[in-house]
UniProtKB/Swiss-Prot annotation:
It comes from Olimarabidopsis pumila. This is DNA-directed RNA polymerase subunit beta''. Zn(2+) binds at residues 220, 293, 300, 303. Its cofactor is Zn(2+). The keyword Plastid applies. PANTHER family: DNA-DIRECTED RNA POLYMERASE SUBUNIT BETA. One of its GO terms (cellular component) is chloroplast. Binds 1 Zn(2+) ion per subunit. Keywords: Chloroplast, DNA-directed RNA polymerase, Metal-binding, Nucleotidyltransferase, Plastid, Transcription, Transferase, Zinc. Its EC number is 2.7.7.6. DNA-dependent RNA polymerase catalyzes the transcription of DNA into RNA using the four ribonucleoside triphosphates as substrates.
Length: 1379
């Protein structure tokens, strides 16, 4: 009884895990027999209690957790806020998806954790609780779905559905939730069956790889070991995993504490010894593993260690390979099935949070951090090195060190509350996530014009296409607007480069036909006073405009200030300036357009290398009608594939430019009508119509032919194909083909139709029904692409004397893809081919650091003529100059540093008439021969002259200009359908004034250098060239500068003058929704400011889309996008590390060594790098041996870690040695390379590493090889036994190959003996199956061998493998980067 009194009494509920530990300790203390007796008693007790309790399970026992209601409500609130942020353009689609998933996953997990305490408190004897939490039936996840919430589902592809199932199975699912639940098909009958078969097949493959691994010796005599340490450079290994790794292993070396040996070599490690070693604080323990065993076809007892069944060293003859395969494959059916995106809660502690220990003010060094965004789109600072963060409170100062590559979530001098998250620590680089690169396409929600608010660079692989890369986080804007049909508007003011064909326009005895308006011909004339009465010049005065437009169609974007019956429609194509080289002649009061070169300047005036500088639309390649383009090399009735195109292969919805090297292309005309969805169509599909047939209410056909009706998103397309219909015979070859071009003279000679084959024809097969078909023979227009445009015809020869600096190259583009339709609204022409000039400089000077040049518009006055020119600055310094004009009061200024000098002043009438007759020119900047002074070179097609260096220049602060009268019609203060006029009250009238320091003025404030008192201007309208136009006809002040800000001053600020200002609004400014101009005023909608008036602003509504660096933007600046067009592509990495979808694909992908993502690719790249570098450093044969061995060690450890990580995340414990046996087999081969041809092995042959070493030593010649990672399937088909391979898969092929090669099977494995009915060489048949030398003889051989070890075999291996650093993959990686 005294003995019993010393025992500790435990009154504790124990679950399945605790029982496992108890049984393990009982076996250690009492042995197997006594333990089984104890467990028998436990079993009997359990059955007795269960019978007495008589637990039954009813639906009433499923109790929903009370806190679920407010948890779900909180999650919905967060999701709603997130949706708002996305709408305002603060987060993009990927960040929204990540955060949404994280919110719901956190809610679901919290509910799961609440479940157990809730049951314990409310109903501890609840049958569901007792069954699931004792481990008898069901698990936490299943009960969570019954009483918590089902949570997030994944679809069959493993993608997360971001709409969670909020109900649980007790409450029942709604219809939507039921469909999502079926779609996910998790934990269902189908899914279980699929998982079971997957896991079974995985087990079969694993067993196939290692079935021949049997314990055949006691000691292989290896001197190597793998070093295990509880802490290393990257991380702390948890004590539990450290103990699990050590127990059951055998020491590879003696362990000393000081000078005392506490454990000796070849001693197996039990729990007592491991605890003692941990207590002593041993830094590193070298153990033997299957990796260090000296044979690949068997294993020794000491390298394997203890048998998991009885706790002693494994017996000879035990088939440990099959046990290993079963151990890894069997848990596959138990794994839970979820998939999550990167981020905190999904991957099991991806990000740890640092919280403030108490309230206080944060202080840190701002120079050591870099502003960035977190994966959820929140602003943060990224630390590059260890950062010390100080938290100051009233009585204490606390310092926290943030490690590198962590996010700091607070600002300097910010006050933080206690327990507030201040930083997020990223995990070390040692972990291996299963990531895959996913593309997320963002589509446009509305129709409009594309605009972006930052510099966007071309993707290098798509230099001349419309795929752009974003260098920094910015917004993409879709400015609202639409394609405007006929009879909607009366007239429009054209701005820069708004090209339009106006077929008919009558204005009181004056007519303008085929007017193509370019540059600022209209804008300068209409908006300057000098042309108020010069209607004879061809510009109508609006007051006497009484004309009507004929059947004109406009194909352009209209802006937000358009409303029905409005007086003014302005098209905004802001900030992209196109100046044409175009001569304008006055002949009988008509403008005659000439096709010329248009120079294209980016928004910020900066050219990068190889950017398109100008383009030329050749009128020969213009078509009035719609049609299809075909090109390639026509050959034997077919079109060969596309030639040398630069095309983005991802999404084909947008218009790409193709750089072509073809000499001809074909245009197949067709008539196209696009109608609204609700239109009444008066023709049937596949019917044949004549000319002038009525198609819809107000549309008639212009050509006859076969009609095709296609219904697309929100519109109907009518296509009319002209041509001949041919009903083919069976003998007709032509009917077999569809969509081909046939050259002249290829028709049937004796037929009546031979005369129609004089030109190229296009044959198209039409199938109205399944049985009937006929062939449509359509006419084709053939275009030959002439030689490239000659630069000498555009510029005089002597202009390019300074060719050392700037080069212009010519490229031809086909603007439409092969077989792509070209659509044009009627009466507008379609340009098929565009010739582009590409700008480059400093070609010969490879070291030139000038990656971009700046282009400016300048005005140059010579002999009274004033011209606008472009200047391209190749020198980084700037030139400023002043030009005097007739009016001595006025002065103009251009400076490169302070503002974007896009700037033009309307000259007097006589000067304008002269300048209109001249061509526009271009100014380029060059360095003179002496490389010291700069000069401007003016390129003009009429004349050229040089202006010398500009020195001693002055400039003023204020630019102003007086215009006597401005006959513009004012815009009404009403909001159109696409724009918003917002009233702005409570501020004083403002005076616009440009200085280099932004100063806001109120009415009575004057500055010293202001000579004239400005009148108060009511409203301004922005112009393309940055001119600000006053819409008040009685005001005589117009300001010129490009950037002009308005400061709205509130009433209570008028005493403080410039000290405090409210919102600044600039013309042309883009801003997101929810920006408030003044207190208690309505929020602005997102858009672009078009007009600023005294009490309101007119905004063109726009939709912002946030995009982060690296996103690919599809489309060009100002391109018209329709609803549903692809706008941007995000490429992001999705992590699926902690979870497994439908069976075991992740473990399987590691074991099959598939390149699933960047991680596996990194491993393969690292292997290749090691092989190259080691060989280069150490030479042959050392390099091959050491390179292969180091590679193999490195990859083995990382593979074991990756597989263990997946299983541990699911709570499945597998001993490392099982995984090591599998990994050893898939990493034991090397590939013979072609670098050094040997007489023994063929290049490309797979051989064992040990065999390669021994053969090389025996032949004394170098064999070139490199390490490879084989998958388990490939390893199964590359064994020493062809019978084993043939019984696995591809039986006929394997046996045929083996017969041809004359292979011999030595029947060493288990499987081949089973197939042939022999004795299995394992277990009791171990000694019968194989003949062995005596034990004593083996030892003698080993001793002799050890004595004769060369330096190469012994010392070198010791140096490389005995120490920890070469075995650890992470350290190997750093060593590789240093090499």
């Amino acid at each position: 009884m005294a003995e019993r009194a010393n025992l500790v009494f435990h009154n504790k509920v124990i679950d399945g895990t605790a029982i496992k530990r108890l049984i393990s300790r009982l076996i250690d203390h009492f042995g197997m027999a006594y333990t089984s007796h104890i467990l028998d008693q436990v079993k009997t007790l359990g059955f007795q209690q269960a019978t007495a309790t008589s637990i039954s399970l009813g639906i009433d026992d499923l109790l929903t957790i009370p806190s679920k209601g407010w948890l779900v409500q909180d999650a919905e609130q967060q999701s709603w806020i997130l949706e708002k942020h996305h709408h305002y353009g603060n987060v993009h689609a990927v960040e929204k998806l990540r955060q949404s998933i994280e919110i719901w996953y956190a809610t679901s997990e919290y509910l799961r954790q609440e479940m157990n305490p809730n049951f314990r408190m409310t109903d501890p004897f609840n049958p569901v609780h007792m069954m699931s939490f004792s481990g008898a039936r069901g698990n936490a996840s299943q009960v969570h779905q019954l009483v918590g919430m089902r949570g997030l589902m994944s679809d069959p592809q493993g993608q997360m559905i971001d709409l969670p199932i909020q109900s649980n199975l007790r409450e029942g699912l709604s219809l939507t939730e039921y469909i999502i639940s079926c779609y996910g098909a998790r934990k269902g009958v189908v899914d279980t069956a699929v998982r079971t078969s997957d896991a079974g097949y995985l087990t079969r493959r694993l067993v196939e790889v290692v079935q021949h691994i049997v314990v055949r010796r006691t000691d292989c005599g290896t001197i190597r070991g793998i070093s295990v340490s509880p802490r290393n450079k990257n991380r702390m290994m948890s004590e539990r995993i450290f103990i699990q790794t050590l127990i059951g292993r055998v020491l590879a070396d003696d362990i000393y504490i000081g000078s005392r040996c506490v454990a000796f070599r070849n001693q197996d490690l039990g729990i007592g010894l491991v605890n003692r070693l941990i207590t002593f604080g041993t830094q590193s323990i070298s153990i033997r593993t299957p990796f260090t065993c000296r044979s690949t076809s068997w294993i020794c007892r000491l390298c394997y260690g203890r048998s998991p069944t009885h706790g002693d060293l494994v017996e000879l003859g035990e088939a440990v390979g099959i046990i290993a395969g079963q151990s890894i494959g069997e848990p596959g059916t138990q794994l839970t099935l979820r998939t999550f995106h990167t981020g905190g809660v999904f991957t099991g502690g991806t990000a740890e949070h640092v919280r403030a220990p108490y309230s206080g003010k944060i202080k840190f060094n701002e120079d050591l951090v870099h502003p960035t965004r977190t994966r959820h789109g929140h602003p943060a600072f990224l630390c590059y090195i260890d950062l010390s963060v100080i938290i100051e409170s009233e009585d204490i100062i606390h310092s926290v060190t943030i490690p590198p590559k962590s996010f700091l979530l607070v600002q300097n001098d910010q006050y933080v509350e206690s327990e507030q998250v201040i930083a997020e620590i990223r995990e070390g680089t040692y972990t291996f996530h299963f990531k895959e690169r996913v593309r997320k396409y963002i589509y446009s929600d509305s129709e409009g014009e594309m605009h972006w608010s930052t510099d966007v660079s071309h993707a290098p692989e798509f230099t001349y296409s419309n795929v752009h890369l974003l260098p920094k986080t910015s917004h993409l804007w879709i400015l609202s607007g639409g394609s405007c049909g006929s009879s909607l508007i009366f007239f429009s003011i054209h701005k820069d480069q708004d090209q339009m064909n106006i077929p008919f326009l009558s204005v009181e005895r004056k007519s303008i036909s085929s007017l193509s308006v370019n540059n600022d011909q209209v804008s300068q004339k209409v908006l300057s006073s000098d042309f108020a009465d010069q209607t004879k010049f061809g510009i109508p005065d609006y007051s006497e405009f009484k004309g009507n437009l004929g059947t004109s169609h406009y194909n352009f974007i209209y802006s937000a200030i358009f409303h029905e019956n409005s007086d003014l429609l302005a098209k905004r194509r802001r900030n992209r300036f196109l100046i044409p080289f175009q001569s304008i002649q006055e002949q009988e009061k008509e403008f005659i357009p000439h096709s010329g070169i248009s120079i294209e300047i980016p928004i910020n005036g900066i050219f990068r290398r190889n950017s398109i500088f100008a383009f030329f639309d050749d009128p020969r390649y213009r078509r009035k009608s719609s049609g299809i383009l075909k090109y390639g090399t026509p050959k034997a009735d077919s079109i060969i594939q596309k030639a040398d195109m630069i095309e983005y292969r991802g999404v084909q919805k947008f218009k790409t430019k193709y750089e072509m090297k073809v000499d001809r292309f074909f245009f197949i005309p067709e008539e196209v009508h696009i109608l609204p969805e609700s239109s009444a169509i008066m023709v049937q599909n596949y019917s044949i119509i004549g000319v002038d047939t009525r198609l819809a209410l107000n549309i008639r056909s212009q050509v006859g032919g076969l009609i095709r009706v296609e219904r697309k998103k929100k519109r109907i397309e009518l296509k009319i194909f002209s041509g001949d219909i041919h009903f083919p015979d069976k003998t007709d070859k032509i009917s077999r083909h569809s969509g081909i071009l046939i050259p002249p003279g290829r028709g049937k000679k004796n037929s009546k139709e031979s005369k129609k084959f004089q030109n190229w024809i296009y044959v198209q097969r039409i199938t109205p029904t399944k049985k009937k078909f006929f062939v449509l023979v359509r006419p084709v227009a053939t275009y030959e692409i002439a030689d490239s445009i000659n630069l000498a015809t555009l510029f005089p020869q002597d202009l390019f004397r300074e060719k050392d600096n700037i080069q212009l190259r010519v490229f031809n583009y086909i603007l439409y893809g092969n077989s792509k339709p070209t659509q044009g609204i009627s009466d507008t022409s379609i340009q098929l081919v565009r010739t582009c000039l590409v700008l480059n400089w400093d070609q010969d000077n490879k070291n030139s650091s000038l990656e971009e040049v700046r282009a400016f518009f300048v005005e140059v006055s010579t002999k009274g003529l004033i011209r606008d020119f472009i200047r391209i600055g190749l020198v980084k310094s700037h030139i400023s100059y002043i030009r005097k004009r007739n009016n001595s009061r006025d002065s103009g200024l251009i400076s490169a540093d302070h503002m974007n000098p896009f700037y033009s002043i309307s000259p007097k009438a006589g000067i304008l008439q002269q300048s209109l007759r001249q061509n526009h020119g271009t100014i380029r900047m060059f360095l003179n021969r002496n490389k010291e002074s700069q000069s401007l070179l003016i390129l003009s097609s009429s004349n050229c002259f040089r202006m010398g260096p500009f020195n001693h220049l002055k400039y003023h602060n204020v630019i102003n200009q007086s215009i006597t009268k401005n006959p513009l019609i004012t815009i009404k203060n009403s909001s159109g359908p696409l724009g918003t006029a917002t009233q702005i009250s409570n501020f004083y009238s403002f005076l616009p004034l440009l200085t280099y320091n932004k100063i806001s003025l109120i009415k009575y404030l004057k500055l010293d250098n202001l000579k004239y008192i400005f009148q108060v201007i009511n409203s301004y309208l922005i112009d393309e060239n940055g001119k600000i136009f006053n819409l008040d006809p009685y005001s005589n002040v117009v300001l010129n500068p490009f950037k002009l800000n308005w400061y709205f001053l509130h009433q209570n600020y008028h005493h403080n003058y410039c000290e405090e200002t409210s919102t600044i609004i600039s013309l042309g400014q883009l801003f997101c929704e929810n920006v408030c101009i003044a207190k208690k005023e309505p929020h602005l909608k997102s858009g672009q400011v078009l007009i600023v008036q005294r009490d309101s602003v007119v905004i063109r509504s726009a939709k912002p889309y946030l995009a982060t660096p690296g996103a690919k933007v599809h489309g060009h600046y100002r391109e018209i996008l329709y609803e549903g067009d692809t706008l941007v592509t995000f490429i992001y990495e999705k992590s699926r590390s902690g979870d497994i979808t439908q069976g075991l694909p992740k473990v399987e992908q590691v074991l099959e060594v598939r390149s699933i993502d960047s991680i596996s690719l990194n491993l393969e790249k690292r292997i290749k790098g090691w092989n190259k570098c080691i060989t280069r450093i150490l030479g042959i044969p050392w390099g091959f041996l050491i390179g292969a061995e180091l590679t193999i060690v490195q990859s083995r450890i990382s593979l074991v870690n990756k597989i263990q990580k997946v299983y541990r995340s699911q709570g499945v414990q597998i001993h490392n040695r099982h995984i090591e046996i599998i990994v050893r087999q898939i990493t034991s081969k090397v590939l013979v390379s072609e670098e050094g041809m040997s007489n023994v092995f063929l290049p490309g042959e797979l051989i064992g590493l040990l065999r390669a070493e021994r053969t090389g030593r025996a032949l004394e010649e170098s064999i070139c090889y490199r390490a490879v990672l084989l998958g388990i399937t490939r390893a199964s088909l590359n064994t020493q036994s062809f019978i084993s391979e043939a019984s696995f898969q591809e039986t006929a092929r394997v046996l045929a190959k083996a017969a041809l090669r004359g292979r011999i099977d030595w029947l060493k494995g288990l499987k081949e003996n089973v197939v042939l009915g022999g004795v299995i060489p394992a277990g009791t048949g171990f000694n019968k199956g194989l003949v062995h030398c005596s034990r004593q003889h083996t030892n003698i051989l080993l001793e002799k061998k050890t004595k004769n070890l060369s330096l190469f075999e012994g010392d070198m291996r010791d140096i490389l493998f005995y120490h920890r650093e070469f075995c650890d993959s992470a350290i190997s990686k750093s060593a590789f980067s240093r090499i």
